[in-house]
UniProtKB/Swiss-Prot annotation:
Effect on the protein upon substituting E110Q: In a breast cancer sample; somatic mutation
Taxonomic placement: Eukaryota, Metazoa, Chordata, Craniata, Vertebrata
Record region (Coil 1A): 88-129
CC terms in the record's Gene Ontology section: cytoplasmic ribonucleoprotein granule; extracellular space; intermediate filament; neurofilament; postsynaptic intermediate filament cytoskeleton; Schaffer collateral - CA1 synapse
Domain of life, source organism: Eukaryota
Protein's name according to its UniProt entry: Alpha-internexin
Start and end residues of each stretch annotated as Head: 1-87
GO molecular function, one term: structural constituent of postsynaptic intermediate filament cytoskeleton
Region annotation Linker 1: where it falls in the sequence: 130-142
Post-translational modification: O-glycosylated.
Any single GO BP term: postsynaptic modulation of chemical synaptic transmission
Species the sequence originates in: Homo sapiens
Family label: Belongs to the intermediate filament family.
Modified residues (N6-acetyllysine): K290
Amino acid sequence: MSFGSEHYLCSSSSYRKVFGDGSRLSARLSGAGGAGGFRSQSLSRSNVASSAACSSASSLGLGLAYRRPPASDGLDLSQAAARTNEYKIIRTNEKEQLQGLNDRFAVFIEKVHQLETQNRALEAELAALRQRHAEPSRVGELFQRELRDLRAQLEEASSARSQALLERDGLAEEVQRLRARCEEESRGREGAERALKAQQRDVDGATLARLDLEKKVESLLDELAFVRQVHDEEVAELLATLQASSQAAAEVDVTVAKPDLTSALREIRAQYESLAAKNLQSAEEWYKSKFANLNEQAARSTEAIRASREEIHEYRRQLQARTIEIEGLRGANESLERQILELEERHSAEVAGYQDSIGQLENDLRNTKSEMARHLREYQDLLNVKMALDIEIAAYRKLLEGEETRFSTSGLSISGLNPLPNPSYLLPPRILSATTSKVSSTGLSLKKEEEEEEASKVASKKTSQIGESFEEILEETVISTKKTEKSNIEETTISSQKI
């Protein structure tokens, strides 16, 4: 009875040492990181060692209990039956405990399988995330290509805008030059009109002078006719007087005085006729010269008027052409200004759209990074849970191996005692064969435990390396996003300054 109580206390204390409270152990294992996992592993090793020591002590107690020498030389059958009953009770209790442990072990194995499937799914998701994180270079290349295209379009728009501004400046200069020329032509037209008015005044004066001269010619002709008439009358009177005087003198001396008087009258008449002819000729020459001068002045005036009219007509035609050209240039300038305003509005709208798309991409990138960090944390937690379960499984394995060794040692100690009447009911042959096979596999299980410990160490190192690499990747992505944001801000400021 002392053996059963001792075995029960050792088994329960070893179970509590190894597992304790399930919630506390799972909280410690899930809350701790890589170093916590190693601490829990060392704790489980110490607990397993203590449980193994306890089981070995119980088995030694069993052996001592069975090997304790009796008071007499022979062993009583009643004591052997009591001991076998006690051993059966202990075995049934141990079987129940092992059944419960096997059930828990099966549950844990199923949970481990589920966690392994989740781990594989998370590894696939992590590989996809790594591939996606490796693909941001391609996404970044597409983004950079789109940015280059947008920058090229922006440069083309800015060059077109600068070209339009240059054309507008050239057209403005041409308009100013045409306006100056138009003003100059208008001033020339005004001067020509003033000269035309002056020429018209001169023509009016010339016509008035011609009319005056014509009147003077008519008056002179009338005067000449009057002078001729007076001259004829005087000649007639003189002839009459001469005839009278000749008749009077004839009476005195007809023969001597008559030839002298006729010759004198003839001379006087010739002198008057020559004087009248000279006066008429000089008057006609003066009239002809004056009329020719007036005609020449009138012809010059009419020619100047005609040239002035033609020049005025040409100036008017040029003015109309320049006005039409100015209107066309003004319309072209207004259309270019409208195009510039439309280009500026379109450019501002495109810049706003690109900034919105950049902000959306940055938000998507941040969400992707946070999702990657969350998946990595979940993966780390699952790795920690897997390591904790591996440690717990190793502890169960050590506990089972300790029980197997205890059973094997107890079987050996029982076989070393005096032979019982019927020892076949003490331990079934199936259990004995299982214990012997399990005892033979203890060395292999120890090797497997060492390999699992090394694998857990490698897994913890890999997880730490994955965490470090992920942190480096996060830092690189944050730095790259900051650089792209700075470059985008600088480009927008430069484009706004250019505008």
